[in-house]
């Protein structure tokens, strides 16, 4: 945000929304922009967070109470009553996205409910780890998924593509692991890395589900794959 403001004199204002809801949360003009936050609920939207039992939580799934139905919320999915019922249940519209709410009312996006995973009993957000990785000058894109581990049950593994002018290999892998160590808490560090093209949807979104499936299918872990490196290799 600061780099864009310095270079071009404009302010990036992150927000959160869906096709089903339009924009629900945003860093609007007139309030401070908090880096790393998607902002506060927009006028006309009552946004709440709930746990797995649909109980109020400070960190959990983003939901919209149907008792305060906003004008921007869809009526339902066309010709798909089951999908509509799944999304609109227990008095809420469920987004399947996870966030935490700060004391000042700003929301911090964590990730999709099916992307968040546990490592050593800590809940990890792929979105947060990927955001750190792409700050490295050599990384063009990144996708983080859980990789099976006998000690921690799972550890963060990053699939990354490299920017033009950089060469994928052990030296770059070492540099990325060091970068991860400097930027992330020990339990969040990238422990495994693979240089690879990333599967995407027709709209260009990374299909983490395919990468997760690849990791599950190779459990228990065999020898290193081509282009794959583990942090312990550089100890």
Located regions from the model:
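AMP-binding/adenylate-forming catalytic core of the ANL superfamily
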Residues: 17, 70, 83, 98-187, ...
């Amino acid at each position: 945000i600061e780099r864009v403001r310095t270079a071009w004199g404009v302010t990036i204002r992150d927000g959160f929304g869906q096709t089903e809801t339009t924009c629900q949360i945003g860093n609007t003009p007139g309030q401070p922009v908090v880096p790393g936050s998607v902002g506060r609920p927009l006028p006309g939207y009552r946004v709440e967070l709930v746990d797995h039992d649909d109980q109020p939580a400070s960190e959990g799934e983003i939901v919209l109470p149907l008792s305060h139905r906003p004008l921007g919320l869809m009526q339902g999915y066309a010709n798909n009553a089951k999908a509509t019922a799944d999304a609109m249940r227990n008095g809420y519209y469920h987004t399947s996205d996870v966030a935490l709410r700060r004391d000042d009312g700003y929301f911090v996006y964590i990730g999709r409910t099916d992307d968040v995973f546990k490592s050593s009993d800590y809940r990890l957000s792929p979105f947060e780890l990927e955001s750190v990785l792409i700050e490295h000058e050599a990384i063009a894109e990144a996708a983080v998924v859980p990789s099976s581990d006998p000690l921690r049950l799972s550890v963060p593994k990053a699939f990354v593509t490299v920017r033009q002018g950089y060469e994928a290999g052990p030296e770059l892998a070492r540099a990325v692991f060091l970068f991860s160590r400097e930027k992330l808490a020990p339990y969040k560090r990238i422990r495994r890395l693979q240089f690879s093209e990333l599967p995407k949807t027709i709209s260009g979104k990374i299909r983490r589900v395919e990468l997760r499936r690849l990791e599950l299918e190779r459990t228990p872990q065999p020898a290193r794959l081509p282009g794959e490196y583990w942090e312990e290799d550089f100890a």
